[in-house]
Regions:
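Glycine-rich phosphate/ribose-binding loops and adjacent secondary-structure elements
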Residues: 31-32, 47-182
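Conserved N-terminal/central alpha/beta ligand/cofactor-binding core
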Residues: 177-178, 189, 193
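An almost-null, non-specific background feature
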Residues: 59, 91, 112, 131-134, ...
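Conserved phosphate/anionic-ligand binding catalytic regions in large, soluble enzymes, centered on
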Residues: 156-164, 191-195, 199-202
Length: 234
């Protein structure tokens, strides 16, 4: 395949914000963690938002988290979105804290060492969202430790997740641009297969579990059986 022009690569990358630890672009979200805390003052004014990684910072109570947010907002551009990141095993605490602090996005990290599968994380997140985030002010997200496919994105969005961030499978910016375009095409193919025109039209009813184990932990309708397994009605 012929190489993309630098401008075309730039345009693709600019349409996709990244979560970064350093050197943020104007569209990027700067992660705030123990590793880069000393360099936040230089980097944050350039970023399009910031994410507080609760899993990689010392424990904080509500007042301490408020204090950190005030300090970070004083360094950031006006009215940038704020994200909280926490382990999926603590998703209820994450959502409760996000609601209390009026956070824009509550993002759960899937690979947190707890052993919870993606399939079991979906109903857990859905129940917590319904309990703690029913005002609609805070969006929910997943932070994946692997490169998501178009199919992965379709499943997550159909499950009610608003934002997905995942690891890029390569470091070169041009390769990342190609990968983003390919993932977008994969997602478009998934939408056509389901018969919807927009990712916003995807719903849980479009999902099917292809095996008994996935149906058991996710509550999805089992393909062929066309309803959730009986224990989900107990």
């Amino acid at each position: 395949a012929s190489k993309e022009s630098p401008e075309a690569v730039h345009n693709v990358l600019n349409r996709h914000p990244a979560m970064v630890m350093e050197q943020p672009r104007a569209v990027d979200v700067l992660m705030v963690a123990r590793e880069n805390l000393l360099y936040i003052r230089e980097a944050l004014p350039s970023a399009g938002g910031f994410a507080i990684d609760l899993q990689n910072l010392p424990p904080m109570d509500a007042e301490e988290l408020d204090g950190l947010m005030v300090a970070l907002r004083s360094m950031a551009k006006d009215n940038v979105p704020v994200t909280l990141v926490e382990a999926i095993s603590r998703v209820q605490v994450l959502h409760a804290r996000a609601a209390h602090h009026n956070i824009d996005l509550a993002m759960a990290r899937i690979e947190d060492g707890s052993g919870l599968s993606e399939a079991s994380a979906l109903p857990m997140t859905g129940r917590s969202k319904k309990e703690h985030l029913n005002s609609g002010q805070t969006q929910t997200g997943f932070l994946l430790g692997f490169a998501a496919s178009g199919h992965d994105l379709a499943v997550l969005m159909a499950s009610g997740v608003d934002v997905v961030s995942c690891a890029a499978p390569m470091a070169d910016t041009e390769d990342i641009a190609y990968w983003l375009q390919g993932t977008q095409e994969d997602l478009a193919n998934e939408l056509r297969r389901v018969g919807v025109k927009s990712i916003d039209m995807l719903q849980r009813k479009h999902l099917r579990a292809l095996n008994h184990e996935t149906a058991a932990v996710s509550g999805l309708r089992l393909a062929g059986y066309e309803r959730p397994l009986p224990h989900w009605f107990a």
